[in-house]
Protein backbone atom coordinates (compact mmCIF):
# COMPACT_ATOMS: atom_id res chain seq x y z
CA UNK A 1 0.00 0.00 0.00
CA UNK A 2 1.40 3.37 -1.00
CA UNK A 3 0.23 6.30 1.08
CA UNK A 4 0.66 10.01 0.55
CA UNK A 5 0.13 12.93 2.87
CA UNK A 6 -3.53 13.12 3.86
CA UNK A 7 -4.56 9.72 2.53
CA UNK A 8 -7.31 8.03 4.55
CA UNK A 9 -7.68 4.37 5.44
CA UNK A 10 -10.87 3.51 7.32
CA UNK A 11 -12.94 0.72 8.76
CA UNK A 12 -16.43 0.53 10.23
CA UNK A 13 -15.53 2.53 13.36
CA UNK A 14 -12.04 3.90 12.76
CA UNK A 15 -10.26 6.32 10.45
CA UNK A 16 -6.52 6.63 9.98
CA UNK A 17 -5.04 9.59 8.15
CA UNK A 18 -1.43 9.55 6.93
CA UNK A 19 0.68 12.62 7.64
CA UNK A 20 3.92 12.95 5.69
CA UNK A 21 6.60 14.03 8.16
CA UNK A 22 10.00 13.94 6.46
CA UNK A 23 13.07 14.83 8.48
CA UNK A 24 14.27 11.72 10.26
CA UNK A 25 14.01 10.17 6.80
CA UNK A 26 12.47 11.45 3.59
CA UNK A 27 9.56 9.01 3.44
CA UNK A 28 8.48 9.10 7.09
CA UNK A 29 4.76 9.02 7.81
CA UNK A 30 2.85 9.52 11.04
CA UNK A 31 -0.63 8.08 11.38
CA UNK A 32 -3.53 9.89 12.98
CA UNK A 33 -6.30 7.84 14.58
CA UNK A 34 -8.97 10.45 13.91
CA UNK A 35 -11.67 9.24 16.33
CA UNK A 36 -9.24 9.19 19.26
CA UNK A 37 -7.42 12.45 18.38
CA UNK A 38 -4.13 10.61 18.74
CA UNK A 39 -1.09 10.21 16.55
CA UNK A 40 1.22 7.27 16.00
CA UNK A 41 4.32 9.43 15.63
CA UNK A 42 6.78 6.73 14.61
CA UNK A 43 10.40 7.91 14.71
CA UNK A 44 9.50 11.55 14.07
CA UNK A 45 8.55 12.33 17.67
CA UNK A 46 9.94 9.81 20.14
CA UNK A 47 9.00 9.58 23.79
CA UNK A 48 12.50 9.87 25.21
CA UNK A 49 14.57 12.17 22.96
CA UNK A 50 14.60 14.03 19.68
CA UNK A 51 15.05 11.93 16.56
CA UNK A 52 18.38 11.49 14.89
CA UNK A 53 18.33 13.42 11.64
CA UNK A 54 21.08 11.87 9.57
CA UNK A 55 21.90 13.02 6.05
CA UNK A 56 21.64 12.23 3.25
CA UNK A 57 18.09 10.88 3.72
CA UNK A 58 17.40 12.93 6.84
CA UNK A 59 16.97 16.69 6.55
CA UNK A 60 16.94 19.20 9.41
CA UNK A 61 14.92 21.65 7.30
CA UNK A 62 12.29 18.97 6.65
CA UNK A 63 12.36 17.84 10.28
CA UNK A 64 11.64 21.35 11.57
CA UNK A 65 8.90 21.93 8.97
CA UNK A 66 7.32 18.59 9.92
CA UNK A 67 7.44 19.37 13.64
CA UNK A 68 5.69 22.68 12.99
CA UNK A 69 3.18 20.89 10.76
CA UNK A 70 2.19 18.62 13.67
CA UNK A 71 1.42 21.71 15.76
CA UNK A 72 -1.44 22.48 13.36
CA UNK A 73 -3.32 19.37 14.50
CA UNK A 74 -5.25 19.02 17.74
CA UNK A 75 -3.94 15.66 18.93
CA UNK A 76 -4.47 14.75 22.55
CA UNK A 77 -1.77 12.09 22.69
CA UNK A 78 1.11 10.66 20.67
CA UNK A 79 2.14 7.03 20.57
CA UNK A 80 5.78 6.97 19.42
CA UNK A 81 7.72 3.99 18.13
CA UNK A 82 10.30 4.57 20.89
CA UNK A 83 9.52 5.63 24.43
CA UNK A 84 6.36 6.19 26.44
CA UNK A 85 3.12 7.78 25.29
CA UNK A 86 3.19 11.57 25.08
CA UNK A 87 0.10 13.03 26.82
CA UNK A 88 0.75 16.73 26.03
CA UNK A 89 2.06 16.60 22.47
CA UNK A 90 1.85 20.32 21.63
CA UNK A 91 4.10 21.33 24.51
CA UNK A 92 6.37 18.36 23.80
CA UNK A 93 6.77 19.19 20.09
CA UNK A 94 7.40 22.84 20.94
CA UNK A 95 10.19 21.70 23.28
CA UNK A 96 11.76 19.75 20.40
CA UNK A 97 11.62 22.81 18.15
CA UNK A 98 13.23 24.91 20.88
CA UNK A 99 15.88 22.25 21.47
CA UNK A 100 16.84 22.14 17.78
CA UNK A 101 16.92 25.94 17.58
CA UNK A 102 19.20 26.02 20.64
CA UNK A 103 21.50 23.43 19.03
CA UNK A 104 21.68 25.54 15.90
CA UNK A 105 22.56 28.60 18.00
CA UNK A 106 25.28 26.54 19.70
CA UNK A 107 26.73 25.55 16.34
CA UNK A 108 26.68 29.17 15.16
CA UNK A 109 28.49 30.18 18.34
CA UNK A 110 31.22 27.58 17.75
CA UNK A 111 31.65 28.77 14.16
CA UNK A 112 32.13 32.37 15.34
CA UNK A 113 35.59 31.25 16.45
CA UNK A 114 36.60 30.34 12.90
CA UNK A 115 36.41 27.32 10.60
CA UNK A 116 35.67 24.09 12.43
CA UNK A 117 35.01 20.44 11.75
CA UNK A 118 32.06 18.68 13.34
CA UNK A 119 34.45 16.44 15.28
CA UNK A 120 35.99 19.57 16.84
CA UNK A 121 32.89 20.62 18.71
CA UNK A 122 30.66 17.56 19.15
CA UNK A 123 32.64 16.49 22.26
CA UNK A 124 32.02 19.92 23.80
CA UNK A 125 28.36 20.08 22.79
CA UNK A 126 27.62 16.59 24.06
CA UNK A 127 30.09 16.30 26.93
CA UNK A 128 27.31 15.39 29.37
CA UNK A 129 26.17 12.49 27.20
CA UNK A 130 27.50 8.97 26.83
CA UNK A 131 30.28 8.97 24.23
CA UNK A 132 28.48 6.22 22.34
CA UNK A 133 25.89 8.85 21.39
CA UNK A 134 28.45 11.21 19.86
CA UNK A 135 28.42 9.61 16.41
CA UNK A 136 24.64 9.87 15.96
CA UNK A 137 24.86 13.36 17.48
CA UNK A 138 27.47 14.24 14.84
CA UNK A 139 24.93 13.19 12.21
CA UNK A 140 22.39 15.62 13.65
CA UNK A 141 25.01 18.39 13.80
CA UNK A 142 25.82 17.60 10.18
CA UNK A 143 22.12 17.95 9.33
CA UNK A 144 22.07 21.34 11.08
CA UNK A 145 25.15 22.44 9.14
CA UNK A 146 23.66 21.31 5.82
CA UNK A 147 20.60 23.40 6.62
CA UNK A 148 22.84 26.37 7.45
CA UNK A 149 24.71 25.93 4.15
CA UNK A 150 21.38 25.70 2.26
CA UNK A 151 20.12 28.90 3.91
CA UNK A 152 23.35 30.83 3.31
CA UNK A 153 24.53 31.10 6.91
CA UNK A 154 27.55 28.81 6.61
CA UNK A 155 29.82 27.39 3.95
CA UNK A 156 32.28 24.58 3.46
CA UNK A 157 35.90 25.73 3.26
CA UNK A 158 37.45 22.50 1.95
CA UNK A 159 38.74 22.37 -1.63
CA UNK A 160 35.81 20.33 -2.95
CA UNK A 161 33.19 22.42 -1.11
CA UNK A 162 31.24 19.26 -0.40
CA UNK A 163 29.19 19.55 2.84
CA UNK A 164 30.01 16.14 4.27
CA UNK A 165 30.48 14.91 7.82
CA UNK A 166 34.26 15.41 7.73
CA UNK A 167 34.21 18.82 6.02
CA UNK A 168 35.33 22.10 7.56
CA UNK A 169 32.59 24.73 7.97
CA UNK A 170 32.64 28.45 8.60
CA UNK A 171 30.13 31.26 8.93
CA UNK A 172 29.30 33.41 5.92
Language-model features: locations:
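A short catalytic or substrate-binding loop motif that flags glycine-/basic-rich loops and adjacent residues
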Residues: 3, 22-25, 163
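Conserved hydrophobic "DFG−1" position in protein kinase catalytic cores
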Residues: 11, 31-33, 156, 171
Amino acid sequence: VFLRDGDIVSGSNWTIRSIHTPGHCSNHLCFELVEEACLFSGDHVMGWATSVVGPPDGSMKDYMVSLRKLLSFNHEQYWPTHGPAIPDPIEYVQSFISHREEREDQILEYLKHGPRKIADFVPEMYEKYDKRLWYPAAGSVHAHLLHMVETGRAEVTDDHREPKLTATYQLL
